[in-house]
Design a protein with these regions (language model features):
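Transmembrane alpha-helical segments in integral membrane proteins
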Residues: 69-88, 178-189
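Hydrophobic alpha-helical transmembrane segments
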Residues: 15-20, 62-66, 95-100, 115-116, ...
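Membrane-interface helix/loop boundary segments of multi-pass membrane proteins
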Residues: 75-100, 127-134
Length: 212
């Protein structure tokens, strides 16, 4: 859905749920990265060197920020959720198409650390795109996810680590993920119900023109 009618495609709760999901997915990715790093320490050092070489460390420049937060997510969504998943979806069920694009998305990042959490992220992005019915949802999620990782994440790393903080973050991660996914499904349901009412209305064409 590249040219959506807002009344048919979007519901505010869907966007709010995505905002709620971002910190949970970021913290979950951090847990996953830590677990993989414990098993394969050399992967983490290779990843850190790659980020520094690419200019994506704490001293990120403006151009790299724009690329990492806006251009990269938009282009990646068009390629993996827009083209790849859409084409595979014609021949395979959603779960298979989503799995395939997520694997390719992980491989695309060309290092083990990023590849593993990019695979998980790809599954989530594919689900959001499919269930939401629009690639704009996965673009919105991807942009916010990268913004958090680029700006907010490094700021949080400056916090003093304590057992209490660790427990709070862990519990917040669970709440963020459960509520985020649940509210996205609810927002999609409400969006569909509203769209059905609008389609049933005699003057729905005029309403859509006004909404656009």
């Amino acid at each position: 859905n590249y040219l959506p009618k807002p009344s048919l495609t979007f519901h505010p709760l869907q966007f709010l749920s995505i905002i709620l999901l971002i910190p949970g997915m970021q913290f979950f990715s951090g847990y996953l990265t830590s677990a993989v790093s414990l098993l394969f320490p050399n992967w983490l050092s290779q990843y850190e060197k790659l980020m520094e070489t690419a200019g994506l460390d704490s001293d990120i420049e403006l151009f790299m920020f724009i690329y990492a937060v806006i251009l990269g997510p938009v282009c990646e969504e068009l390629v993996f959720r827009g083209v790849t998943m859409r084409l595979v979806r014609r021949a395979l069920p959603f779960w298979a198409a989503n799995l395939m694009q997520a694997v390719l998305f992980g491989i695309f990042h060309m290092n083990w650390i990023q590849g593993i959490y990019a695979f998980v992220l790809g599954l989530v992005l594919g689900w959001i795109c499919e269930k939401g019915g629009s690639i704009y949802f996965s673009m919105f999620f991807h942009i916010l996810f990268n913004f958090w990782g680029t700006i907010i994440g490094p700021l949080l790393n400056n916090l003093k680590e304590t057992d209490l903080l660790g427990i709070i973050i862990f519990l917040f991660t669970i709440v963020s993920l459960v509520l985020g996914f649940s509210l996205f499904r609810l927002g999609t349901k409400w969006r569909d119900q509203k769209a059905a009412r609008l389609m049933a209305a005699p003057d729905h064409d005029d309403h859509f023109e006004a909404a656009e």
